[in-house]
């Protein structure tokens, strides 16, 4: 089982992942929790390059670095874990590439699809939970109750977060378009709902879609 979480930073992905891991643990299901970029020695080094605010990276260079990190994670961790029957919860996967590099950076979609196919080895999530939040609200939530968009009481932003509001508006539009194209796999949730409400919806959907997963015979 591969469960992925998507959304712009500040939408609450990490919180919902922790809630889900705890809930699964109570049912005796031990989940492997991973993140993108990262998850292997090489992928973590790539993550540092991608997020370091002093590094200037071209859009195509950014795409290839994210994809290289993903390829390492898929080959070294995800494929073996899925083959052994483990449950994986992944903070970001290829939908982030479509939204961020496709819609955000404007990279050709055909090129994106080709590179995604290579980096994922054709692996697709069983279900994706997308926490939808407007960029302005996400930045407020993450850094300050009042400041938008790029100066938050002295807290330094990483390179991706410095891309600006228009970039994140395009990213959100990308996610919403993915929802239209893949309505069943890609589940949209309102990130402004209380944590417990979102968590309850996630558990309900997992139980509905995969009854033998949460309620094994």
UniProtKB/Swiss-Prot annotation:
Taxonomy, superkingdom: Bacteria
Reactions this protein catalyses: dTMP + ATP = dTDP + ADP
Signal peptide: none
UniProt entry keywords in alphabetical sequence: ATP-binding, Kinase, Nucleotide biosynthesis, Nucleotide-binding, Transferase
The EC number(s) this enzyme carries: 2.7.4.9
GO biological process, one term: dTDP biosynthetic process
Gene3D superfamilies noted in UniProt: P-loop containing nucleotide triphosphate hydrolases
UniProt cross-references to InterPro entries, sorted A to Z: P-loop_NTPase, Thymidylate_kin-like_dom, Thymidylate_kin_CS, Thymidylate_kinase
CDD domains, sorted: TMPK
Single GO MF annotation: ATP binding
Residues engaged in binding ATP: 7-14
Gene Ontology CC terms: cytosol
Keyword Manganese: no
Function of the protein: Phosphorylation of dTMP to form dTDP in both de novo and salvage pathways of dTTP synthesis.
Family per similarity comment: Belongs to the thymidylate kinase family.
Protein name per the record: Thymidylate kinase
Species in which this protein is naturally found: Pelodictyon phaeoclathratiforme (strain DSM 5477 / BU-1)
Gene that specifies this protein: tmk
């Amino acid at each position: 089982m591969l469960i992925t979480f998507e959304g712009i930073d500040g939408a609450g992905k990490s919180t919902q992942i922790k809630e889900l891991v705890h809930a699964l643990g109570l049912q005796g299901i031990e989940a492997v929790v991973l993140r993108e970029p990262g998850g292997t020695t090489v992928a973590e080094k790539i993550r540092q390059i991608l997020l370091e605010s002093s590094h200037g990276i071209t859009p195509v260079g950014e795409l290839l670095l994210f994809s290289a990190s993903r390829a390492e994670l898929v080959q070294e961790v995800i494929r073996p874990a899925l083959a052994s029957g483990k449950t994986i919860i992944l903070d970001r996967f290829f939908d982030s590439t479509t939204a961020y590099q496709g819609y955000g950076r404007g990279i050709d979609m055909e090129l994106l699809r080709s590179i995604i196919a290579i980096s994922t080895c054709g692996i697709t999530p069983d279900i994706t939970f997308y926490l939808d939040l407007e960029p302005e609200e996400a930045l407020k939530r993450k850094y300050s109750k009042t400041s938008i968009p790029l100066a938050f009481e002295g807290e330094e932003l990483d390179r991706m977060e410095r891309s600006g509001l228009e970039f994140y508006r395009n990213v959100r539009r990308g996610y919403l378009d993915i929802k239209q194209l893949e309505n069943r796999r890609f589940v949209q949730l309102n990130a402004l709902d209380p944590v417990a409400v979102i968590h309850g919806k996630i558990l309900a959907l997992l139980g509905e879609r995969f009854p033998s997963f949460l309620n094994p015979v």
